[in-house]
Amino acid sequence: MSDYILSAEINLPLLKWMTSFKLNSNLFSTSRNQSLKSISEIYRDLQYNIIPPKDEELQNLWTHLYDLNNYYSNSIEYNQVEKSLMGLKSKYRNSYLKGYYEIINLFQSIANDFEKLSSPISQTTTTTQIPIISFNKNSVLDAINNRKNENKENSFKFLSSFESYVPTVEEIKRIYCIDNKEILIDKSCTLPVEYKLFHSFSLLNLYVYLIIVIRIIKLIGEINRQSSNASENQEILHLLKEYSLHIKSIEEFQLQLKLNNLYYQPTKKEIILKYFVEINSNNNLNNLNNNNDNNLNNNNSNNNLNNNNNSNSNFNNDNNLNSNINSNDTSISNNNSIINNNSNNSNTNNNNNNNIINNIKIFEFSEKELKYSKRYYSYNEFTLRPAELPNNSLGIETQNLIFYTTSNYNSGNSNSGSNNSNSSNNNSSSNSLINNSGGNSNSGLIPKIKFNHHRPKDINPKIVLAVYNNILSMSKVIDKKTINSMNEIIKNNNNNNNNNSNNNNNNNDEDDSDYEENEFNKEFNNQFEFGSEIIEQDKECYICRFRSEFISFCNYCKCKMICDLCSVNKVCWNCYFKVDKVSGNEQQQQQQHFIPLEVVVKLKDRKYPRLIYMLLRSYSFRDLMNTLYQDRFERDSVISPKDRFTYKLHKTKLYNFHLVLPNCKNPFQTKEIQIFDDYSLIIALRLLMNFILSNYIIDQKEVPPPPTQPSSRPQSPPTVSPLTPLNNHHHSGGSLLEHAIARNFNNNSVEVVSDDNTSGSGTGGSNSNSNTGGSYNKFNNNNNNRKNSTGSGTNSRNNNSDNEYSYNNNNNNYNNNNNNKIINNNSIVTVENPILWNIDKFILNVIESSIDIEQSLKIPSSCIETEIEPFASGGQANIYMVKHIDWPMLSNCPEGSYVFKQFIETKDSLQLEEDIEREMYEEKIYQTYKTGESVDNFKYNFSNVEQTDKKSLETLFYEEVDKLKRLQFSDYIIKMPAISDDNPNKRGMLLECATAGSLKTNLLEYRSWKLVIRFMMDICLGMIDIHKCQIIHRDLKPDNILVFENFNSSEASDENDERQREFGGLICKITDLGASIQKELVHDNNFTSTFHTDDYVPEEYGRFQYDGEKVDIYSFGCTFFEMVTKHRYQYKHPTPLHRDFLTTDFQYIPIRIKTLIASLLAEQSQRKQSFNEVYNDLQDIYKNVIPGLPDIPLSPISTNGSQFCKRCNPQK
């Protein structure tokens, strides 16, 4: 068979099918079905002739290929696929895997040859890129004719077997440590699937899994439409169900996720009824107190208080809601629900409590249906509330956000902030969940809907990238003039294009014609007849909700209103995805696409971060997947010192994007900033913030300072310019965060300041015309005073900072903290289905440590007297011998009992040079981008700075102290009696001194088999304790194993007596936990590097999928090998060398010990699973193998010396 055929993968149609979705074929390289091989496995067998294929197998293979090609020819656009893959070459480390374009061309030639070969008419030969397949023509034709029906069945077997190439749910949970913390499917994103960016590797696998099933169903539907035989259709469906190994439908796929606690969609009542009770009761009480303060007549205050206290609802196990709600009419809805609770007056008795559940009406609606409900809401009517999902079976409570609405039918009252059971009685308290925002007496005729928003609290990282859905589309703000102009534009476009679609839809999205009004919209329109009035000159961007008279329509679709920040060359995102702006033609962008992301920016002195939308460009989805999955660096290559800036051994880069910014000077041009590491991202965010500040801040009118003393009567706030964008700036995520932004150019930083909590713009509850409350912010920047007036309502929190003055209208401000559930740190929440995205794994933890250390463990540094010069050093610390300790608990210890490990800054000249160059580059590129100049001359590749470089010395110190403190219970871990942290220049820990040195210094002295195996058992017990505390050591080697004399254990046993009798009390203890890491962070690509010794780590170390415990087992195996052979191989990942030497050399080593070492140094899948297994084997060897063996030779010399062995090559 030709070498051309052997140099590529096998299946053309399936390969084209996969590449049409830009999926990585490497994801399908592991098949668990023994009878069906994957594409890569078949190719590998042919490439290396592991299993020589038989003629019959080849005939069957080509038959499958031919039939599948016929089935998929109508559903795959070959020209489009090949065009999208044009120029893409292989980026795999294994050179025998070709690029997609090369494989497609090769298979196209093979398919053409096979077509000619199988055709009885064509007898002529033509020159092709590859030779004609050399096998019997008649046998192929006979196979096709005789197995026509069987081929169809085999083809579907082959197709459905692709489900087995993706890891199972159990494997994903185990490999990626999901542990019920991630929800894996996001359905609310409106972008096409190939434009989605998943920052979760487990989600990527299940995403591929789902795509396969969807594709199968689509292919079946295509076949059904082409086939007229109904029985044949049933046969096809039967074949699919029969040979689908994991799932048969998308519904079953969702069911499987739910059964495995990977997907949970709460029911409508269990969330609403439970969390409405807590929030409503608290809000009712606060609203009651606020209204009572504003009422001149307080005769009914006690009665109202009692009634409000009775309105607390209990959600019991029988799902009954017991409450007494004092409201005229309240409607609540979450993500999929609207709840109406009706009570006639404030004195409703408890007899109606059991019947309140019957008044609940549930209307199902999705985000799409809500935004297509032909209702345009004012942005200040939308907020979000926090909520939690019910406890699952494992007792783990998932925290989330939900939507619900409240409606206040108040047709006769001019006060939108209170409800009256009697029109003449203005003293009754409002029992609505939230006060509606209305500005005048006529607004009371219009029922209002309001969403309360609460963002996750205490997001610690300074910079967070997260995939976040655009929930802003739920809060459309379009004035009547804009609606009319949009109708005219749509009508004109439809007439020009001879499009007969319905023009009654007023929404802004491209798929308006596909929307059909459902039952929800009919019911919704009947019950909620409301509208909103806004200033006509204040238009709103449909993406960021920024309102200004300078907002313009998209140049292409002429429908969407966009601002400069949210557009590219005055074109909206949806159009930019599909249209080539350079040529103006409607062509799919095959080589690159843009991904909308939100950036959560934590700036100086800001408790809550700012969310910013940005566009990221990746040249292809395939490149993105390769970036996430493949190691770009050759591990065994020698790196010179000058290449240190660009070399990172185990770091997979997540930054491969461009940030698109409009040009401040020329709005018709854009600037693209490449984001390739943390520093370039910081620069990009600074530029983005600078653009926002320079374009969107309009100087406001001077506002007089607030009164120094609170007045007894409410005062009207000063007037504010209606063009002030910050008053109406709608934050991403649908929140009502009103910002006061200030710039400080002294340190080239941008600061975003806002209230400490999300503020809902509401109205006062007084009897006069409602006045919007305000909080006045005053900031001093470069001696320039800027004053800002932002809307503040009932859901705002007072900000008591030094540079901000708060004036509360009607005493309506109260603390929201008691009502809001605390969301998990670093969590992003979507909208349509409450989906929690855990983004901790994509954040490098560079924050200062907040570990609490017991005071009893601390002693002053002045009480520790050490030698002047350290006797050892390494990493971030120097080791000093302690002479005396002036501390009551330790003063009686003899000299030489302890050492002091002092943490120091150890940056070499290269690191210092890199820091200086990086700072200069940051400033240069920032100023260059800021002025709009070109930056082509400023090319600099930052190295991915290691964890030790990013974390401060204080953080590293406290983290190691915390780990050692948790391991003090173990007799096989070095003891730490005290630490000293009062002096930053002498911060360190007191450790017991190893009087016998380390295993490295005594390697040749320990020749007794009993002593060596006993030491190995000690190390095993120490590693068991470390793994029990969920810690991975990552740097286990003879240097970090200390030997102590006169061991006295707290527990008396025969082993301890034997140790004292035969070994003189010698015991091994593990030290140096500075390289260790928490087990849950092992799979974080930000933590897969920085700490290791190449001689003692396996090849998989540093990859995303490596097992931390097995890495420690491998390091233990290397140490064991060095102890019994006295040889050390200075070679990266020396598994082959170990295996060769164990089989050919060192005949004095028992076979049982060789077998154990080989199992420790094997591949990851064949390696020992835990140290408990290793310890059991060592115990058996100690009892049954070691007795009677002679000692290890004094200087064992290898007969097959290796150039990498230090003992075989002492001159090196």
From Swiss-Prot:
InterPro entries in alphabetical order: Kinase-like_dom_sf (IPR011009), Prot_kinase_dom (IPR000719), Ser/Thr_kinase_AS (IPR008271)
Protein kinase domain location: 865-1182
UniProt-listed Pfam families: Pkinase
Signal peptide: none
EC assignment: 2.7.11.1
One of the record's GO molecular function terms: protein serine/threonine kinase activity
PANTHER family listed in its UniProt record: UNC-51 LIKE AUTOPHAGY ACTIVATING KINASE 1A (PTHR34495:SF4), UNC-51-LIKE AUTOPHAGY-ACTIVATING KINASE 1A (PTHR34495)
Glycan-carrying positions: 229, 299, 309, 328, 335, 341, 344, 391, 419, 422, 426-427, 435, 499
Active site: 1035
Recorded superkingdom: Eukaryota
Catalytic activity: L-seryl-[protein] + ATP = O-phospho-L-seryl-[protein] + ADP + H(+); L-threonyl-[protein] + ATP = O-phospho-L-threonyl-[protein] + ADP + H(+)
UniProt keywords, alphabetically: ATP-binding, Glycoprotein, Kinase, Membrane, Nucleotide-binding, Serine/threonine-protein kinase, Transferase, Transmembrane, Transmembrane helix
Residue positions binding ATP: 871-879, 924
Major site of localization recorded for this protein: membrane
Family: Belongs to the protein kinase superfamily. Ser/Thr protein kinase family.
Its membrane topology: Multi-pass membrane protein
Subcellular location(s) of the protein: Membrane
Bias type Pro residues, positions: 703-720
Bias kind Low complexity: ranges: 489-507
Gene Ontology annotations for the cellular component aspect, listed alphabetically: membrane
Top EC class, one word: transferase
Protein name: Probable serine/threonine-protein kinase DDB_G0284491
Region (Disordered): 288-329, 412-439, 489-517, 703-733, 751-813
Biased composition (Acidic residues): 508-517
Listed transmembrane segments: 197-217, 673-693
